[in-house]
Design a protein with these regions (language model features):
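Helix-helix packing/entry segments at the starts of transmembrane helices
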Residues: 150-155, 222-238, 286-320
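Transmembrane alpha-helices of multi-pass small-molecule transport proteins
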Residues: 44, 59-63, 84-132, 211-215, ...
């Protein structure tokens, strides 16, 4: 009991000292949420940081809910644009726009040499995973409902937990094993394999989830050797460049039919009229990532993390309103199981972390998020500035 009280007093004291650094650190922390933008996984690296007072929890919940809402609108815009434009120019221009914001931030927040990296192999590998995975993710949009695509993609946090156990030898108890099995059953139900209505295109967001989870393993190696901002910038810029040869190769190897018009290597439909929409896409993503970072900065992760799963029902509602999409029963049932599984695993992660090292925070799995978790010294600026 005395140890618990001491930790609580230490966390409050540390939080007060760090309060004046919150806004300066916000751009760095915002890059942790890039852009998976969930769509995706919340259960990866856990790191020590002071926990905010409980009185600020409502603000944190409001921030994370608004951030997830913006992510949903971002994906809905992408789905709408893919009806008229090929995917490759959209991904490239969006990456360029995000880079125009991120690179100046890197130069502003630190010395210019910090943008240089010796970890080219890791960055290129992560960029390949992102370019490949999220190209497949968005390629599924014209064929599936927004709810179905996002539900299957939310297998990413489950896969990340499995990969961490297999490749990083992290311990996992019976509670989380049971929750993982429950969640994967939900993914299978959402995909509905073996049924007459099964669509092979539903495998695309699952492959993206696997790519994303694999990139999380690399993120843990990068996260202790480079800042989150530099690592996130490399991932986004390189992935934006990789989609060009990736799209060209896809069109050379495969015969793209009429149904795959959005996958064709064509720039004819791309005009400057679409540029404001791409700027809006980039702005939505940046604001959403900032809001998620702010939420984890001012509130207890245990209070706000489960609200990231609000993305799934919001995507279902917006898909119905914007595209007249009525999700199938298996999508809704699988979605509910994934949400229950993910929230329970997050709860167990937090409980275990608090028992061993005290208050924690964790990485977000919003769609498109590069998943780079900052070091403890990056989150706590006193180690650099004092």
């Amino acid at each position: 009991m005395e140890v618990s009280k001491l930790r609580y007093l230490q966390s409050i004291t540390s939080f007060g000292r760090n309060l004046k650094f919150e806004y300066k650190q916000l751009p760095r922390l915002a890059l942790n949420r890039f852009g998976a933008g969930n769509q995706g996984a919340k259960l990866s690296t856990v790191i020590t940081t002071p926990v905010a007072p409980a009185s600020r929890t409502p603000q944190g919940i409001a921030a994370i809910m608004l951030g997830m809402t913006l992510f949903v609108f971002q994906d809905a815009m992408m789905k709408s644009l893919l009806g008229d434009f090929p995917i490759w120019p959209l991904l490239l221009v969006r990456a360029v726009i995000c880079s125009l914001v991120m690179v100046p931030l890197i130069l502003y927040l630190g010395p210019p040499h910090r943008i240089l990296t010796p970890l080219w192999a890791l960055h290129v590998t992560r960029a390949l995973l992102f370019a490949f995975g999220f190209s497949l993710y968005y390629a599924a949009f014209p064929f599936m409902t927004l709810a179905a695509v996002t539900t299957i993609f939310f297998a990413a946090p489950l896969l990340t937990a499995v990969f961490a156990t297999v490749f990083l030898k992290e311990h996992i108890g019976i509670h989380r094993i049971s929750a993982l099995v429950f969640g994967f059953i939900g993914v299978i139900i959402a995909m509905k394999p073996g049924a007459d209505s099964f669509q092979w295109v539903s495998v695309l967001p699952l492959i993206c989830a696997c790519s994303y989870a694999t990139s999380q393993m690399l993120a843990r190696r990068i996260g202790h050797r480079e800042t989150a901002m530099v690592a996130g910038a490399y991932t986004i810029i390189l992935a934006g460049l990789i989609v060009l040869p990736l799209g060209w190769l896809l069109n050379v190897v495969f015969d793209i039919g009429e149904q795959g018009a959005h996958l064709r290597w064509s720039w004819e439909a791309f005009t400057f009229d679409i540029l404001p929409w791409l700027v809006l896409l980039g702005a939505l993503g940046m604001v959403a990532w900032t809001l998620l970072s702010r939420a984890y900065q001012i509130a207890d992760v245990g209070a706000v993390a489960p609200f990231e799963y609000a993305y799934l029902p919001m995507a279902t509602v917006l898909g119905y309103i914007a595209f007249d999409e009525v999700p199938a029963w298996n999508t809704l049932f699988g979605m509910a199981m994934i949400i229950v599984s993910g929230v329970y695993i997050a709860f167990r992660e937090i409980v275990n972390a608090r028992q061993s090292i005290g208050p924690t925070t964790e990485a977000s799995f919003a769609p498109g998020n590069p998943g780079i978790v900052p070091d403890a010294h990056e989150i706590n600026p006193r180690e650099k500035l004092d």
